[in-house]
Amino acid sequence: MPTISVAMIIKNEAQDLANCLDTVKDWVDEIIILDSGSTDNTKEIALSYGAKFYENSDWQGFGKQRQLAQQYVTSDYVLWLDADERVTPKLQQAILSAVKNDRENTVYEIPRVSEVFGREIRHSGWYPDYVVRLYRTNYAQYNDSLVHEKVEFPAGTKVEKLTGDLEHFTYKSIHHYLVKSAGYAKAWADQRQAKGKKATLWQGISHALGCFVKMYLLKAGFLDGKQGFLLAVLSAHSTFVKYADLWERDQHKH
């Protein structure tokens, strides 16, 4: 049977890392962790699980960090996880079955269910949040995007959906959400600015309103209770902020 590695890029994940690794430690052949400068006891936790621990603080974005981490993988397959994710038993079986079958020219999408502010979000356009996370190590890799990086693979590749959820404990509080979304907004604006793009505040307003309507009404976010409403409002806010950030940068040129 082909071998499989878990690969992760992390920073200051002592709170979540053990819970994540507990769901994979008994059935993967290798755990690869690339740290970008943790100041908590992330490293000690990783090493206690037998992980191969590497460090790179020269941060050039999520995509390039994942590319570097993949270079350390020695197994036939790589499974990408974030520290705030957990592999369910059903998903574990689906992953092992895919690796055993070892189909050519295939990458695998995993359905992710996110818990936000204490509730699983099953609507709002968030579920099933299919993400490509499993593939042959020498077949594909992430692009070099600063943020919201995606796996790139050859034309003609079959994308197969696996069963079993990947649990994602994404936002633990509103403060946690705002801190993470601010980082994403900055990276988005950096990326757009580097391509010579500009934005207007009206674009920010219209995209924010569109975001709320889509999530809460069209994607039935109201079925996710108060958390669904809060998530739609915060997502609209984050959408506005990223356009406002890009707009504000252009003002300094005048």
Swiss-Prot record:
The keyword Cell wall biogenesis/degradation does not apply. It is an enzyme of class 2 (transferase). Its EC number is 2.4.-.-. It comes from the Bacteria. CDD domains: Beta4Glucosyltransferase. Pfam families: Glycos_transf_2 (PF00535). Transmembrane segments: none annotated. It comes from Haemophilus influenzae (strain ATCC 51907 / DSM 11121 / KW20 / Rd). Belongs to the glycosyltransferase 2 family. WaaE/KdtX subfamily. This is Uncharacterized glycosyltransferase HI_0653. Keywords: Glycosyltransferase, Transferase. InterPro entries: Glyco_trans_2-like, Nucleotide-diphossugar_trans. The keyword Transferase applies. PANTHER family: GLYCOSYLTRANSFERASE, POLY-BETA-1,6-N-ACETYL-D-GLUCOSAMINE SYNTHASE. SUPFAM superfamilies: Nucleotide-diphospho-sugar transferases. GO terms for molecular function: glycosyltransferase activity.
